[in-house]
């Protein structure tokens, strides 16, 4: 019996550290595993870090769940963030206690913790990748270490390549690293470890320079501190998170955060970021960039952000015209359909729990996990491909293999499969061929030439 697994499934221990995804699945996802945890929430204290990252479509579900836990399960809820979204001011609000703020004067607190200066260098029509690369390299020459955060994986790769090309042409010795979710967790940890080591040694070796180009993943509680941070324009909450990686430990009086915009940026698949960017762009026309982290401006941003969301968007819209929020509340569509078929339900509960649970996903999971040949992942691929492998051990070994897995979208899996880059081990684990995993970028979805010649 795996005691650790049982505790993980049931939450039968005093202190639990989990993710927002796992918590929301416990409340709303179908299946029995999540339900085993629900009873453990009674008489508990729930602390949500970075609550502004709550997916927009889960907003009303989250508010209703928090109100239920507070009123019926005697739960105390603490929402932590530097950018508090106005969840208590929506049509279906979260019910805050009186004097809910744990800090008495947020304006005074903001002024006391103002560690960065924000500059808006966006230009009409946006800048090219080469222009941003030149800007970053020039900044590294003057200020030292530079972090650049972009919205898209493609942008991170292109910008990394442009910076490398610029440095090669100018024969400058600056270390450049890349971070994105196309790298497995073990790979990202190794890169972050080297980044922290270089940042820690900058006092001893001030002539050294580091440029880190990353997607938003570095904003998720990663403890790094750069004197200069460039952020591709997005919502103010994202900008605030980026600013949290600048002068984080107060090494200087004020660090520098510069906002820029790419030309022809396609955010059509990232609705929340696209909406946030539009509102941020509008506000930047009417406010000084250096004031956007103030409580007043942040409140204005969130008010506009939720104003443009439709009521349906906040209720978790489904492929049909229904929403999960409606299925779990009045379920009027279900009742109407029952009436039309002469099947009036005799139950007091008319909620469509099964349909709601089947449809609920915190993050669109149109992805497939692939085991990649990075470090220990190579040995795991060999292990899973061994015909003598004990299939009873697959659950335990797969948990260990998570450090070497990359989630790929369906179109990426299709493209890699067409290139012959993916194959299944004897244990049925989808694996990536070695030439399609790059030490700088991670998974390569374009055709790669094999460096080995078979004669």
Cite the ranges covered by each PLM segment:
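Inter-Walker segment of RecA-like/P-loop motor cores
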Residues: 1-28
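Loop/turn-to-beta-strand initiation segments
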Residues: 12-15, 21, 42-45, 72-78, ...
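Walker B catalytic acidic pair
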Residues: 20, 49-51
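SF2 helicase motor core recognition
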Residues: 26, 206-207, 211-225, 241-249
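Post-DEXD/H (motif II) to motif III coupling segment of the RecA-like Helicase ATP-binding lobe
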Residues: 34-45, 52-108
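C-terminal helicase lobe and adjacent C-terminal extensions/tails of nucleic-acid helicase motors
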Residues: 70, 133-143, 147-149, 154-189, ...
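Interdomain hinge/linker at the junction between the two RecA-like core domains of SF2 helicases
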Residues: 82-140
């Amino acid at each position: 019996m795996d005691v650790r697994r049982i505790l993980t499934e049931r939450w039968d221990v005093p202190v639990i550290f989990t993710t927002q995804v796992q918590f929301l699945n416990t409340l709303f996802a179908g299946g029995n595993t999540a339900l085993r945890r629900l009873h453990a929430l009674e008489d508990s204290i729930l602390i949500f870090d970075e609550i502004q990252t709550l997916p927009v479509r889960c907003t009303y579900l989250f508010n209703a769940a928090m109100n239920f836990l507070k009123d019926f399960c005697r739960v105390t809820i603490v929402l932590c963030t530097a950018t508090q979204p106005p969840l208590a001011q929506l049509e279906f609000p979260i019910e805050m206690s009186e004097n809910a703020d744990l800090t008495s004067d947020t304006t005074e607190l903001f002024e006391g913790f103002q560690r960065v200066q924000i500059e808006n260098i966006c230009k009409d029509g946006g800048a090219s990748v080469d222009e941003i690369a030149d800007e970053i390299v020039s900044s590294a020459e003057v200020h030292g270490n530079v972090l650049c955060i972009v919205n898209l994986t493609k942008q991170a790769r292109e910008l990394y390549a442009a910076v490398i090309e610029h440095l090669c042409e100018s024969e400058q010795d600056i270390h450049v690293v890349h971070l994105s979710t196309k790298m497995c967790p073990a790979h990202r940890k190794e890169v972050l470890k080297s980044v922290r080591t270089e940042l820690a040694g900058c006092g001893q070796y001030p002539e050294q320079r580091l440029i880190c180009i990353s997607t938003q993943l570095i904003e998720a509680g990663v403890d790094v501190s750069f004197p200069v941070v460039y952020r591709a324009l997005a919502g103010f909450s994202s900008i605030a998170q980026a600013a949290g990686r600048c002068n984080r430990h107060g090494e200087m009086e004020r660090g520098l955060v510069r906002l820029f915009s790419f030309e022809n940026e396609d955010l059509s698949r990232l609705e929340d970021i696209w909406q946030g960017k539009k509102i941020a762009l509008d506000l930047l026309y009417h406010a000084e960039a250096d004031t956007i982290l103030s409580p007043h401006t942040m409140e204005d941003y969130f008010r506009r952000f939720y104003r443009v969301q439709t009521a349906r968007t906040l209720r978790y819209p489904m492929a049909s015209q229904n929403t999960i929020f409606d299925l779990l509340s009045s379920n009027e569509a279900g009742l109407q359909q029952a009436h039309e078929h002469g099947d009036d339900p005799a139950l007091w509960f008319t909620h469509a729990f099964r349909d709601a649970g089947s449809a609920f996903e915190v993050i669109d999971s149109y992805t497939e996990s692939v085991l990649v040949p990075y470090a220990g992942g190579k040995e795991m691929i060999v292990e899973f491909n061994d015909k003598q492998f004990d299939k009873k051990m697959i659950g335990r070994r797969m948990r260990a293999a998570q450090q070497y897995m990359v989630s790929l979208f369906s179109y990426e899996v299709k493209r890699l499969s067409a290139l012959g880059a993916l194959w299944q081990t004897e244990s049925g684990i989808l694996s990536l061929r070695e030439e399609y995993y790059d030490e700088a970028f991670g998974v390569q979805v374009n055709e790669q030439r094999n460096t080995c010649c078979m004669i």
